């Protein structure tokens, strides 16, 4: 289902969604999103997706510890990316942590936030 974007309507401001991951290209995506936000007078939403791990589900305590560690790592990655955006453009991005399939979580965040008007993904320029 497609939701009408409201980012440029009165009372709304455009937002750019940037996916924060562990790739070297992520810094370029954060850079672009921060500069875009300044240029259009918008905001940035930073998303970190924790992929659900089906292993150790029968060991509930182990799964809980692994989940807590994944959330700590996600917060640390968002701290770094938010700090970079703030240093580049003096903005404070919104931070979102989701669990599950990355593609589905990206689509879900876009669907639920009608102010998101751009998705920034960084890509390698190499042969990988």
Q: Which residue ranges define each predicted feature?
A:
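Small/aliphatic-rich secondary-structure junction motif
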Residues: 5-60
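Conserved acidic residues
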Residues: 14, 116-117
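A short acidic, amphipathic alpha-helical/loop segment
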Residues: 32, 108-109
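Glycine-rich phosphate-binding loop signature in dinucleotide/nucleotide-binding domains
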Residues: 109-116
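Glycine-rich, Arg-bearing micro-motifs that act as flexible, cationic patches
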Residues: 118-128
